[in-house]
């Protein structure tokens, strides 16, 4: 059995209790105004109060609202709506109610206020149009007829004075018809327009000029100086020396393009960065890889003294020699005494090193292949390639990072909880959990979160309607 009037009676009882101050458990302060209310009603009607009371229910007896956004009359109106289900604007500005409803996340009220503002704009626009139509209506009076008659006589006299001038101008056009003048005699009309430019320019802009003169001026085609379109090629400023040095991965062998060498090297750097973020499949290499042909051409271009190794190979060779000279096993048995403040521990194998430089040299050994040899870019254009999926990378470091996705290796372990991660930046994000820091704050409800992803999920869940309303 249902009682349809139960909800209405419940609201009436709650409204009476609020006016009597009975069982009111919170006070809302808007500037100097105080409003006694029930937390359950506020949290049920406003998402702002719901989030406000959810964390610390016993310590939120007084709620301070921003008086710069929420005015006391607007909050009183919204409070009346919460307890009675009625919204009566009376003489209160709709903008104040909209601001207060947006601040309190009352989305139904926000939609109503926006609808009223749109209707107000439409009504004001229609009123302006109606007033303009009334002003444009002719006045049936004798004075108006006399004035229009005098104006027409003045226009006719002005037109008669202009006709002899036109006759002289047209007589010099070799008797061409009026239909062909606009096509074949543009230079002649251009000279005529230049001579009368000082007179017709003022007549076009002035509203009191005769209609016949204005129409005659607008019928003239534009002169060569004003209306001609310049289709000549003009190079862009600051890009005169820009010449593409390759097309689809093949180097241009033109001897005149001497300034294209730095551009090719710049394209190689961009290519390396693109390989890190988006790997290439073996199928695309079989069809024809433009990057491979470009690297092949560069291998022959930058050779010197008969050596075809790149600078990257030299760096790898220097690192290998340094690692051979200073092995970690020799460090542990050398008996060198180092102060505790200078000890550097490898985060991957927990070995101890006397300086950060030696630690960096040791870290590079973790990214070698199992046979203790580095995959280097050879002169024929081969690059480090994943043996499982066939993706290619610019260096060995990115290849090793990629191989963790197949092997599931997690070399970075948290020292407090023992949780492991594949990448170091994931371990850094996880460390915030143990420090109890909450650097990410919501600008609508002032809640704070440890991770940025938690903040984004919170906004999508609780403030999605408000964000859309603000964007609109």
UniProtKB/Swiss-Prot annotation:
GO biological process, any: regulation of transcription by RNA polymerase II
Name of one Pfam family that matches: zf-C2H2_4
Keywords on record: DNA-binding, Metal-binding, Nucleus, Repeat, Repressor, Transcription, Transcription regulation, Zinc, Zinc-finger
Superkingdom of the organism of origin: Eukaryota
Region feature Disordered, mapped onto this chain: 127-155, 197-236, 269-334
Species, as recorded: Xenopus laevis
Family: Belongs to the krueppel C2H2-type zinc-finger protein family. ZBTB18 subfamily.
Gene Ontology CC annotations of this record: nucleus
Protein's name in the database: Zinc finger and BTB domain-containing protein 18.2
Keyword Metal-binding tagged: yes
